[in-house]
Amino acid sequence: MTLDVPVNQGHVPPGSVACCLVGVTAVADGIAGHSLSNFGALPPEINSGRMYSGPGSGPLMAAAAAWDGLAAELSSAATGYGAAISELTNMRWWSGPASDSMVAAVLPFVGWLSTTATLAEQAAMQARAAAAAFEAAFAMTVPPPAIAANRTLLMTLVDTNWFGQNTPAIATTESQYAEMWAQDAAAMYGYASAAAPATVLTPFAPPPQTTNATGLVGHATAVAALRGQHSWAAAIPWSDIQKYWMMFLGALATAEGFIYDSGGLTLNALQFVGGMLWSTALAEAGAAEAAAGAGGAAGWSAWSQLGAGPVAASATLAAKIGPMSVPPGWSAPPATPQAQTVARSIPGIRSAAEAAETSVLLRGAPTPGRSRAAHMGRRYGRRLTVMADRPNVG
């Protein structure tokens, strides 16, 4: 059995953290166990057979690589935690009792990560040192076929040494075998000395306790007390409350309908009052128009009084207006008050009457406004037609 045989006795997949621990520990135990024995007392067949029959330095190198990976992960975690804590505390993004409590709990854990990463790196270096020691010892070890050939030659020389002729050859063969013995012993002792540091591993400390175990108990107690304080909620008649709530909603809907109906009645009343006011306004407008029509009728009655005076006649000469003979009254017709009143009372004739007062040439001639009196604007009621009297000529 060689020193590196115990490496595979754990049956752990290479590359895992457990393989690292098992591999290094097994090699250390194997070397420590054989260091108590005398490698010089063992023939070269045993020492060479052990060195050549094992898996070699492969498990040790795999363990070293696994330790390197674990150290890198621990170091990265420690760096990330430290950067996050530094950013939170230095930038003042989170300050107060909760922040202080978190920092006090995390900083010890960050320190543990850094320490464990360093120990993992040391374990990796020790595993690589053990692998290097094995390679050196393997190079010094006599190959088993050479030892077997020496033993075969010795047996042949001994069997054919009938007359002592093979004695010098037998001595030479025995001397070579002794050299093989010494060489294997030296290789094993050197391997044990070089691999001794792998037997001294710094123990890993468990991670610090960053939580308060009593706080969990206090939290459970507080929750239980809170449930006890609010146990009255179980005695509430939720079904009755739901029933009363539905009754309240129904009453609210009824009140809403009443308010809606009242609003409709109010709107109808306002529309009724508005209609009455509109009817009153129309009646007043009709009365004003009727009064205006009555004033016009009074004017026409005054117009009907024209010509009611006695007829007077006289014999005289006709007056001359140019080459035309005209009645004497045309030159200066008397302006009777009745004619002025009638002219002013009729809107269509008023302008003609005023023009007749200022005219000197044709005072007794019929005015054009009289002929246009029939074309006045339409009035409500019976339409009146007024015909002007023509004055007697001659």
UniProtKB/Swiss-Prot annotation:
InterPro entries membership: PPE_C, PPE_dom, PPE_sf
Entry protein name: Uncharacterized PPE family protein PPE23
Organism: Mycobacterium tuberculosis (strain ATCC 25618 / H37Rv)
Miscellaneous remark of the record: Was identified as a high-confidence drug target.
Disulphide connectivity of cysteines: none
Family per record: Belongs to the mycobacterial PPE family.
Pfam families in the record: PPE (PF00823), PPE-SVP (PF12484)
An individual GO BP term: response to host immune response
Taxonomy, superkingdom: Bacteria
Gene3D superfamilies: PPE superfamily
